[in-house]
UniProtKB/Swiss-Prot annotation:
One of its GO terms (cellular component) is bicellular tight junction. HEAT repeats lie at residues 368-406, 603-639, 757-793, 1111-1147. Residues 14-23 have a biased composition (Acidic residues). Residues 1-23, 337-361 are annotated as: Disordered. Tubulin-folding protein implicated in the first step of the tubulin folding pathway and required for tubulin complex assembly. Involved in the regulation of microtubule polymerization or depolymerization, it modulates microtubule dynamics by capturing GTP-bound beta-tubulin (TUBB). Its ability to interact with beta tubulin is regulated via its interaction with ARL2. Acts as a GTPase-activating protein (GAP) for ARL2. Induces microtubule disruption in absence of ARL2. Increases degradation of beta tubulin, when overexpressed in polarized cells. Keywords: Cell junction, Cell membrane, Chaperone, Cytoplasm, Cytoskeleton, GTPase activation, Membrane, Repeat, Tight junction. It comes from the Eukaryota. Belongs to the TBCD family. The keyword Hydrolase does not apply. One of its GO terms (biological process) is mitotic cell cycle. Its main location: other. This is Tubulin-specific chaperone D. Found in a complex with at least ARL2, PPP2CB, PPP2R1A, PPP2R2A, PPP2R5E and TBCD. Interacts with PPP2CB. Part of a supercomplex made of cofactors A to E. Cofactors A and D function by capturing and stabilizing tubulin in a quasi-native conformation. Cofactor E binds to the cofactor D-tubulin complex; interaction with cofactor C then causes the release of tubulin polypeptides that are committed to the native state. Interacts with ARL2; interaction is enhanced with the GDP-bound form of ARL2. Does not interact with ARL3, ARL4A and ARL4D. Interacts with beta tubulin. Interacts with TBCE.
Length: 1199
């Protein structure tokens, strides 16, 4: 039974949250099903027609089946589009099935295709098209003789045959007429009726899907008029015996019980009441003895509930309760006609007395209803859903008084002693009763308060909570009530329901619940027409708008709060339910939402809400305490802002008691030692946010003792960041730094623009001292604290502060891994520059000026060379990223105010370093460097002076063209950055960056960086001067980075690529060209005494490439290779021999006379053998090629 038959009923049991609620799902829903017809008709016809041709080829057979499955799956949501085509598809496939000459494999394949069609369209619709004449019964039945129930490859055949047989069972003739004479001598055989029943019973206990089809067959067959008289009793007896001897604790028992329960449920559904009633009590008794509620098999419990409710319906006469509440008619025409004739007359329940006496209700009904009520509390949704439907169906046949008792029992599910499963089941049951008109208006006064509680139901369980399914189902109840009742019936509850639905729409944690509430609100607006401002709200809070949680809390809530009916309920909900929520994100959003809503109801917030929040700050519950402090901070700030806008003092909203309460928060937490431990982390962050907001609100606390307490908290937090858990460290650090900036600006100023001398001395001295702390996190916090100080606090101390921060950026052996400290020091330097501003001739102790600007630039540019790595990877990248950002901010600041301070050499170094970073291998940092580079190039207010080759850069990177470039994508970044190789000012640095990328490990980076480099090399192949310049630059990069493995190893790989691709072929015309001579010398120096296998392998490839250059250099290269043939590492010897062999094949460097012998030595020698053996073969190669034999150098004697 599908769970999606009604909105919101199939809510997930476990709380599922989608914090990153992106637009992917929304887009899919917005597009909807766009299909208009079965577009693959011709392809399908051809596919089905060629089944005999693909039968022999397993690959082709599986391909055809998969293709058909893909085609059909497209129509899962619009299966009706297949209806005009079902008949010809069925006929095509049945031709193979009914053809006596068809191979068994073809028959099985045809049934696989038939199953796929039935799965998509649904077997009830598809089966009608199967042939079901009298002549079809025996052939279908005979097909079962060839079936093996244990063959797991052909279960689709058995499934479809059972369904086909269930259709043929509907023929309107007695089966005995098909039997002929069963008792002829020597020809005794079973009757058709017995054969069908035997097939059905045998397949009810198999483990595959044929079991489901067998249950359908039984229900159609046993309920036939001729069969029920002879076989129903015996089949029910067999079923009850099967249930009795089966145990749900074994797999075989579960399978047998599943099939039997399905069959019984189908029989009591399709059979006539008078036929089933004599057996109902016995079946119920047997079912009770099976104790299915104790099973851990969800499906068995669901089938048990389904069977119980159908037994209950069998006990009761099939009648429509005259007492039920009705709104409108099922027929739209009748409903419209009635509304025209009686526009104001509501349709209510019949006034006639209930003619059904309680004596007509059998005593078994009580047991049935009791079991259904237990099913409402089951741990699985599908069981609760089935039980809820059963409750609704049963109540519809009960007398009014008994049905009201059932309603009362359902309401008992909503006590706080019950689990979330009971609440969910109760909601589903109430919805079923309401939509069937069985929940009379007189009961609404009891039901509505329960539903309002269910709309906010949430229980903490472990690290998360349960209840999202309850809230979802409660929305379903509201949706059902909107359709079930006339507006005047719900009018007394409109205010409460509308407020509750609005609250769920904007403030529920779960996106599914927000959307369900939005749908329920929309249904009520449309059906009831009495919800205040309904149209305005539902157009703003629609299905897609409520998909984003932050948007709901901060934007939509503000709009809805503009309607006074909803303002106070929303504020009340936030204070009561969300400020102390277990999810920290919800607490933070709730505090911000309260800040917004306080603007809508300032008097109520100040008079009622703020005192409650203050009392909650001392709660023993950590989450409540944390959320309350955050809320106090945000509300106080909001009320101050409002008072300022209205030209009133903040004391008009916050009286002296409230002010005192704000001041007492820190001291009370400190006295209770609540700043310690994991809970203390939350409270430190919250109080820091409180300090910031109170300071920004300019509360009159200057000179108060609380300021010292707040300052202690900030200092203690920054000094002990290393004791805070890593996942919350960043948030606490940011909160403390922001609090310090606000506190100093407001409460440490003696008068505007002048700091308290004692506070300035104490804080600056403290933070500068802590910059040398052995704890990295302490350095981070204090560096950022210095960066956050206001300008008047740095007055007279700027030189000292910058010197301290500069010292943090220097790498020493003891703090080489302190990359985060260096990053935060750079951020602090940048922020200080923005704070103090620029004055070209100003004092260096007060502003950025001519005297200190070059030193600041040197500090930042030096940090671009930070390539520190540790177990976390390239941590120096954090430093380089911060340095690039700081350089951009500083340069733009100088460009706006004092462009003359930007000197040409400095600007050239800056732009070249950025170009290098924009050519390197890490996507994220390459993209950041490119953005900074282009921001400086295209700055126009005014333009940055002295940018090297500005006209060429603007031509290569036009503003409009590069705006859409994804610099993080290697395919887009490297081809553009490689163009800078043509500009001499940038060539060195770009080549340095590209060399690292071309010789890297990431496939996409290597491919596109190589492609960009080779494109440039191709352009200069016919320009010897340009090639000479490029070669000189390349050698300079190599020379400057000798023994620097970060650059030299990838550079060797880059050189190998370039030599192998003929980038320097023009140099081969000259013997002993300076380029190759110097390159050989550099390579020898790089691998001298090296034990790095990767470096040695890369150098071998370069040596092999250098062989192409004629002259004395070739002999030296061969000598170097022959030295490596006797390297101590066997892997290097083997690798050298392999590459030399390829080199001999590639380049014509070996005389023809000795070529075969050289290749034979290289290929036949075991180069990983003992060194004396290898050395002899190496010397032989030296003799053949005329290269002097290397001589062993004796080790100096040890004295």
């Amino acid at each position: 039974m599908a769970l999606s038959e009604e909105p919101a009923a199939g809510a997930a049991e476990d709380p599922v949250e989608d914090p990153v609620e992106d637009a992917g799902e929304d887009a899919a829903l917005a597009c909807g099903a766009a299909l208009e017809s079965f577009g693959e008709s011709a392809e399908t016809r051809e596919l089905l027609g060629h089944l005999p041709a693909v039968l022999a080829d397993r690959s082709a057979r599986e391909g055809a089946l998969e293709r058909f499955r893909v085609i059909m799956d497209k129509y899962q949501e619009q299966p009706h589009l297949l209806d005009p085509h079902l008949e010809w598809m069925l006929n095509l496939l049945l031709e193979f099935v009914q053809n006596k000459t068809s191979p068994a494999d073809l028959v099985h394949l045809a049934f696989k295709f038939l199953y796929i069609i039935s799965k998509v369209r649904g077997y009830k619709t598809f089966l009608r098209l199967f042939p079901h004449e009298v002549a079809d019964v025996q052939p279908v039945l005979d097909m079962f003789t060839n079936q093996n129930p244990k063959d797991h490859e052909t279960w689709e055949t058995r499934y479809m045959l059972l369904l086909w047989l269930s259709v043929t069972c509907l023929i309107p003739f007695d089966f005995s007429r098909l039997d002929g004479n069963l008792s002829q001598p020597g020809q005794e055989r079973a009757s058709t009726m017995d054969r069908i029943l035997q097939v059905a019973e045998s397949y009810l206990v198999v483990s595959d899907k044929a079991r489901d089809a067998a249950a359908v067959l039984v229900s159609k067959f046993v309920t036939r008029p001729d069969v029920k008289q002879k076989k129903m009793a015996s089949f029910l007896d067999w079923s009850l015996c099967t249930l009795a001897r089966s145990s749900f604790q074994t797999i075989e028992g579960v399978i047998a019980m599943d099939g039997t329960l399905q069959a019984l449920a189908q029989i009591f559904k399709h059979g006539k009441r008078e036929d089933c009633l004599p057996y109902a009590a016995t079946v119920l008794q047997c079912l009770d003895s099976c104790r299915l509620p104790d099973s851990n098999q969800t499906l068995l419990r669901k089938l048990g509930v389904k069977l119980v409710q159908r037994l209950g319906l069998t006990f009761l006469k099939p009648q429509v309760a005259k007492w039920r509440y009705q709104r409108g008619c099922r027929s739209l025409a009748e409903s419209l006609q009635h509304s025209i004739q009686n526009p104001r007359e509501p349709v209510t329940q019949a006034e006639t007395p209930d003619s059904d006496g309680q004596d007509d209700v059998p005593e078994e009904v009580e047991s049935v209803i009791e079991q259904l009520l237990v099913g409402l509390k089951d741990k699985d949704t599908i069981v609760r859903w089935s039980a809820a439907k059963g409750i609704g169906r049963m109540a519809g046949r009960l007398p009014k008084e008994l049905a009201d008792d059932v309603t009362g029992s359902v309401l008992d599910c909503f006590s706080f002693q019950e689990t979330d499963s009971a609440w969910h089941g109760g909601c589903l049951a109430l919805a079923e009763l309401g939509r069937r008109g069985l929940l009379l208006p007189s009961r609404l006064s009891d039901v509505v308060p329960v539903i309002l509680r269910a709309l906010t139901y949430e229980e903490k369980r472990g690290a998360c909570s349960v209840g999202s399914n309850v809230r979802d189902a409660a929305c379903y109840v509201c949706w059902a009530f909107a359709r079930a009742y006339e507006p005047q019936e719900l009018k007394p509850f409109v205010a409460a329901i509308s407020s509750a639905l609005v609250i769920a729409t904007v403030f529920d944690r779960d996106v599914n619940c927000r959307r369900a509430a939005s749908a329920a609100f929309q249904e009520n607006v449309g059906r009831q027409g009495t919800f205040p401002h309904g149209i305005d709200i539902l157009t703003t809070a629609d299905y897609f708008a409520v998909g984003n949680r932050s948007n709901c809390f901060l934007v939509i809530s503000m709009f809805i709060a503009g309607f006074p009916e909803y303002t106070q309920p929303m504020i009340e909900h936030l204070v009561t339910m969300k400020v102390g929520h277990w999810d920290g994100t919800i607490r933070e959003l709730s505090a911000k939402a309260l800040r917004n809503l306080a603007q809508r109801a300032p008097e109520h917030t100040a008079r009622e809400v703020f005192p409650r929040l203050l009392s909650m700050t001392q709660s023993p519950d950590l989450h409540t305490r944390h959320g309350a402090v955050l809320a106090c901070a945000e509300v106080a700030r909001s009320l101050h802002t409002l008072a300022t806008q209205q030209g009133r003092p903040v004391s008009d909203f916050l009286d002296e008691k409230a002010m005192h309460g704000l001041k007492q928060i820190h001291q009370q937490l400190y006295d209770r030692q609540l700043y310690r431990g994991l809970g203390g982390e939350l409270m430190r962050q919250a109080v820091c946010i409180l300090i910031e907001n109170v300071a920004l609100s300019k509360m009159p606390f200057r000179g108060d003792a609380v300021i010292d307490g707040w300052q202690w908290l900030i200092n203690d937090t920054l000094k002990n960041l290393h004791l805070i858990s890593s996942h919350s460290r960043q948030h606490i650090k940011e909160a403390a730094v922001s609090a310090l900036a606000a506190l100093c600006s407001e409460y440490h100023a003696q008068e505007p623009g002048e700091a308290e001398a004692a506070a300035q001395e104490e804080l600056v001295k403290l933070y500068l001292a802590e910059l040398q702390s052995p704890e990295e996190m302490t350095r981070c916090g204090c560096a950022l604290a210095l960066g956050a100080l206001p300008a008047f606090f740095l007055k007279g101390r700027l030189r000292q502060v910058l010197a301290g921060l500069r010292a943090v950026t220097h790498i020493s052996p003891k703090d080489v891994s302190f990359a985060e400290a260096r990053r935060d020091a750079l951020k602090a330097i940048s922020r200080i520059c923005q704070t103090v501003g620029v004055r070209a001739e100003g004092p260096p102790d007060e502003a950025v000026c001519r005297e200190n600007v070059s030193q600041i630039y040197c500090t930042l540019l030096d940090c671009l060379k930070d390539y520190t790595t540790d177990s976390r990877g390239d941590v120096g990248a954090w430093v380089r990223e911060a340095a690039m950002t700081s350089l951009m901010d500083l340069t733009l600041l100088l460009g706006r105010n004092q462009p003359e301070l930007i000197e040409a050499p400095l600007c050239q170094q800056l732009m070249c370093c950025l170009a290098q970073q924009a050519s390197e291998k890490i996507d994220r940092f390459r993209a950041h460097a490119a953005r900074v580079f282009l921001a400086l190039l295209h700055a126009d207010s005014p333009a940055i002076p002295h940018v090297p080759a500005r006209p060429e850069l603007e031509r290569l990177f036009p503003r409009a063209a590069v705006a859409s470039v994804n610099w993080g994508a290697p395919s887009q970044a490297f081809p553009r950055m490689a163009r800078l190789l043509g500009l001499p000012a940038y060539r060195y640095h770009v080549l340095l960056g590209l060399a690292v990328s071309v010789g890297g490990l990431t496939e996409s980076t290597v491919r596109y960086s190589t492609q960009g480099l080779f494109e440039y090399m191709k352009e200069i192949q016919n320009d010897p001067a340009a090639l000479e310049d490029f070669g000189g630059t390349l050698l300079q990069v190599f020379e400057d980075n000798l023994l620097n493995d970060r650059v030299s190893v990838p550079l060797l790989k880059t050189l190998d690529q370039m030599l192998a691709n003929g980038c320097f072929d023009i140099f081969t015309a000259q013997e002993n060209h300076p380029f190759c001579v110097k390159l050989l010398a550099l390579c020898k120096e790089e691998i001298k005494k090296s034990k790095d296998v990767q470096k040695l392998r890369s150098s071998i490839a370069v040596f092999c490439g250098l062989v192409q250059f004629p002259g004395d250099v070739r002999r030296k290269v061969l000598l170097q290779l022959f030295l490596l043939l006797c390297h101590p590492f066997p892997v290097i010897r083997k690798n050298t021999a392999s590459q030399v062999y390829e080199m001999v094949l590639t380049y014509d460097v070996v005389p023809t006379a000795v070529l075969d012998e050289v290749m034979a030595v290289l290929s036949s020698t075991a180069w990983d053998a003992e060194l004396p053996v290898v050395r002899a073969q190496r010397n032989r190669l030296c003799d053949l090629l005329g290269v002097p034999r290397p001589q062993l150098v004796p080790k100096p004697a040890v004295r």
